Amino acid sequence: MFRGHKLNLQRYYEGLCGKALFLAIWAADCDKVVIENPTPSKVFDFPPHTQAIQPYEYGHPVSKKTLLWERGVQPLVPTNIVIPNANCHEAGTWFMKGGKERQKNRAKTFPGIAKAMAEQWGTL
């Protein structure tokens, strides 16, 4: 968001729009709500998350913290804990390489996490 100690106004605006969408979903008149998001910038002052999960808790040997905001459901239970051998923040790992796929890779939902969500919350 900041480059050279200057605020990138476009990214800040997009972050504010993202927060507005988040808050609209969180405030929805629904008994059960789950929102998944990477750790947001502190400048946006999101409400506290209810759970932090890692891909390595669901069978993927990668460290990439993802936050969950849950209401009306039980916390997601790890299904296949493995030892991580890659971190999305380490220079040179597959996860953060530049190029056309970088944004897509950073937004990736790991299949093991999606499967756990479907199996644990899909019948609610």
Residue ranges and their predicted role:
Residues 1-124:
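Conserved active-site and SAM-binding loop architecture
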